[in-house]
Curated annotation (Swiss-Prot):
InterPro entries: CHK_kinase-like, Dhs-27, Kinase-like_dom_sf, Oxido-Kinase-like_Enzymes. Disulfide bonds: none annotated. Belongs to the choline/ethanolamine kinase family. The keyword Kinase applies. It comes from Caenorhabditis elegans. The lineage of its organism: Eukaryota, Metazoa, Ecdysozoa, Nematoda, Chromadorea. Transmembrane segments: none annotated. Keywords: Kinase, Transferase. GO terms for molecular function: kinase activity. SUPFAM superfamilies: Protein kinase-like (PK-like). PANTHER family: AMINOGLYCOSIDE PHOSPHOTRANSFERASE DOMAIN-CONTAINING PROTEIN (PTHR23020:SF41), UNCHARACTERIZED NUCLEAR HORMONE RECEPTOR-RELATED (PTHR23020). It comes from the Eukaryota. This is Uncharacterized kinase-like protein D1044.1.
Length: 376
């Protein structure tokens, strides 16, 4: 990222619209986040200090700004599909802006999300972007490898349980029409399958034919079929993050607790097991996942049912939901794993790790991929 996008200063002016000439009233630094692991969007940190005490109470800082411009990682991993990816990014941007707008007045106890300062989708393309609370210096994120430790997995499942319970509680207030999963249409699922097939070429000894064998999991009508299966199980629909991997959870430096869930670009309605499957399959070793799935599901359910005099579904229904939706959720997860494998193999995309560490991470991603394929 060599230059600051034109829209960023305009977003700053919109955030500080109650102040005349904010770039004169405040000292404002715009920092491109060149090493951001954001796959889709271009990201910035905004630092603001007042020029005088008279405006100190107007300061909001630091601020995280994300704009719908294809990131360097996306461009490097998928150089041949820039136009197609930009159209996807339009959809993702609109969905995240909608989420922050719809839920801005609701407190999700136990499921923290950043405070939103600004949101505009591509209906107003010149001003499109999102600005949120920035936690720099207070938080850390973890890598796909090693992934979540025991304490983190339990915290994540508790947080999801609290979130799902709240969503069910306020279900009548939610504009569900805004959360149709329009992204996962037939064309998008075909694209996921075709791109994931490249994983076979990258690792022919381990994966030759393996992605092709599970083509059935890349169900082009998977969203509707998942909802039908969910209804047959007698389960409620909830709001799903749909991209709940390690990079989208921020952890407090001092307490080790969850500080915030971020990046709601893929958010939609869906079964309660969708995000649970992603956490366990993307964030854990194969051995850990297989040995502890039932225990982790039970931990989620214990927290979830504590919100109700009579829970809206049983533990057996939750287990069946996990099994029922495992294949479709992991079809989209395989796509993510293939891109992280490419990233770890490319020194220019993982600047923090040495060659040996990058190779170790790539091999662990491959092991998780094989484990998922074996279980589909």
């Amino acid at each position: 990222m060599s230059e600051i996008a034109e829209v960023v200063p305009k977003i700053i002016e919109a955030i500080f619209s109650s102040v005349q000439e904010p770039f004169k009233t405040f000292n404002i630094t715009i920092k491109p986040l060149e090493n951001s692991r954001s796959f889709w969007s271009e990201c910035y940190q905004i630092l603001v200090t007042p020029n005088s005490e008279a405006h100190a109470d107007k300061v909001v800082s630091p601020i995280f700004v994300k704009i719908p411009r294809i990131s360097a990682i996306n461009a490097a991993c998928d150089p041949d599909n820039a136009d197609e990816n930009m159209e996807i990014l339009r959809t993702l941007t609109a969905q995240e802006v909608t989420f922050y707008s719809d839920f801005s007045g609701i407190q999700f106890s136990g499921f923290p999300i950043p405070r939103s300062y600004y949101g505009e989708n591509l209906g107003n393309e010149k001003m499109a972007g999102l600005a949120c609370e920035d936690y720099s210096g207070k938080v850390y994120s973890i890598d796909f490898v090693p992934g979540f430790d025991e304490s983190q997995v339990l915290q994540l499942l508790e947080a999801l349980a609290h979130f799902h319970a709240k969503i069910i509680e306020i279900s009548d207030e939610i504009p569900w029409k805004n959360y149709e999963n329009v992204l996962y249409d037939a064309a998008y699922i075909r694209m996921l399958h075709n791109d994931t097939l490249d994983f076979e070429k990258l690792c022919p000894a381990e994966l030759s034919g393996r992605i092709q064998e599970v083509k059935h999991a890349f169900d082009e009508d998977g969203v509707r079929n998942s909802e039908k299966k969910n209804e047959k199980l007698g389960m409620p629909l909830v709001i799903c993050h749909n991209d709940l991997n390690a990079s989208n959870v921020l952890w407090n430096n001092e307490t080790g607790k969850i500080q915030a869930f971020i990046d709601f670009q893929h958010v939609s309605k869906g079964p309660v097991s969708f995000d649970i499957i992603r956490i366990l399959c993307l964030g854990l070793s194969v051995e850990n996942r297989r040995a502890n799935t039932q225990r982790y599901l039970n931990h989620y359910y214990t927290t979830f049912k504590s919100h109700f005099s009579t829970a809206p579904f049983t533990f057996s229904q939750l287990e069946e939901s996990y099994r029922t939706h495992f294949n479709f959720v992991n079809a989209t997860s395989l796509f993510s794993l293939s891109y992280y494998y490419k990233m770890y193999k490319d020194e220019s995309l993982d600047l923090k790790s040495g060659a040996d560490e990058r190779e170790h991470k790539a091999q662990e991603i491959l092991r998780r991929t094989i484990g998922i394929l074996d279980d589909m």
